[in-house]
Amino acid sequence: MAKTELDLLIRGSVLLTMREEEAVIENPVVGIRNGKIVLIMQNDLFTEEEYTARKVLDRSNTLIMPGLVNTHTHLAMSCFRGLADDLPLMAWLHEYIFPAEARHVNPEMVYAGSLLAMAEMILSGTTTFCDGYFFVDQVARAAKDAGMRAVVCQGFIDFPTPDTSDPSRQMETAERFIGTWKDASPLIQPALFCHSPYTCSPETLVRIKEAARREKILYVLHLSETREEVSLIQDCYGKRPALHLHNLDVLDPDTLAVHCVWLDEEEQGVLADCGVRVSHTPQSNMKLAAGIAPVPAMQAMGISVSLGTDGSASNNDLDLFREMDSTAKIHKVATGNPAVMDAARVVRMATSEGAGALGLQDRIGSLEVGKAADLIILDLNQPHLTPMYHPFSHLVYAASGADVLTTVIDGNVVMENRKILSFDLEAIMREVEKIAEKIRKSCRK
């Protein structure tokens, strides 16, 4: 009998499917062909006589799990990492970040900064991301070169941007981007990103949402990140931010709201009723002293909450393992309840909930036959991971992105034994250092 040929065969010690049933499989074997998972079983049920593989990854004392999903970031801002810290959000934005972007953001910077950030994500177990920035064709090009799965958002804001000097022509930029990338790669999906209700007029918010609905793509925006934002929107429109957006009819299941730190109970109910999904960014919110989003309350109302890192300039890393740890702990403190945000729930937020937030739940977020082969392999042979009683506990409270040995995206091994295989990381790091030197010189003036 002819053997079934696999592109990749993976063996490990433990596998987390992130399905409701059969969540943990001991001594697993995963078979991959044409970018899809074609078998998952225990090793003692696997027979060498039935299968042959072009490549085998066989490591003892490893954990296999779905790749992590970062539902909110600004990748090219890796070039601004550490430029301005320990500041309130509005001072950070208006005194440092917006001026730096006006001077330095160009296609070359966005490509190099995005690719550097993708290396950081791949090395720390993220396989899919949602990014909002400028010159987004360069973000998409970098994602294609890196082999990452991506939702890439064209940004909108009611003042001149690095890629569009006339705000009234931002939609032309977006239309070109969507036309180029909507069907260019199965791994890349365009989306539209309104910066926030305080930087986008009601007309802009509605116009961009209408375009997103026409194109059947995701609509993303920052929402209620700070108390100051809430007060500003109330003063301008007489409503709290989420109610303002609801009044504009821009909230629906294809809306991803980021931060959501200062939602009151009525606003949470509106988001739940509209099916809006939320990206929680705890480390950025802590660093900017924005506050703690009411995630347990939102989840109790049925709102799907995923995890994002935000950009490197406000975090300052892109390691979702650190976000998981922060998520589990910060809400225990905020609620006074140590049972809130258990480890398994937090891992779901970084995997299956993230996939759902981006509309990719049929493709990624769990390890199942027929789904895309987006997975990571962690090295459990570490002092801080020995012994292991409960895998979810270790992933949230003990592991870090540095424990990821291998990253597979769409069946392709993009990182193996901590080495990026899909592009030249050293060359990109050198390029970003050149960009940073220009930024340093401008800061001295």
Curated annotation (Swiss-Prot):
Binds 1 zinc ion per subunit. It holds the Pfam family Amidohydro_1. The keyword Cell division does not apply. InterPro entries: Amidohydro-rel, Deaminase_MtaD/DadD, Metal-dep_hydrolase_composite, Metal_Hydrolase, MTA/SAH_deaminase. Substrate binds at residues 101, 195, 225, 310. Keywords: Hydrolase, Metal-binding, Zinc. Signal peptide: none annotated. It catalyses: S-adenosyl-L-homocysteine + H2O + H(+) = S-inosyl-L-homocysteine + NH4(+); S-methyl-5'-thioadenosine + H2O + H(+) = S-methyl-5'-thioinosine + NH4(+). Zn(2+) binds at residues 72, 74, 222, 310. Disulfide bonds: none annotated. The keyword Membrane does not apply. GO terms for molecular function: 5'-methylthioadenosine deaminase activity; metal ion binding; S-adenosylhomocysteine deaminase activity. Its EC number is 3.5.4.28, 3.5.4.31. Its cofactor is Zn(2+). It comes from the Bacteria. Catalyzes the deamination of 5-methylthioadenosine and S-adenosyl-L-homocysteine into 5-methylthioinosine and S-inosyl-L-homocysteine, respectively. Is also able to deaminate adenosine. Belongs to the metallo-dependent hydrolases superfamily. MTA/SAH deaminase family. This is 5-methylthioadenosine/S-adenosylhomocysteine deaminase 2. The gene is mtaD2.
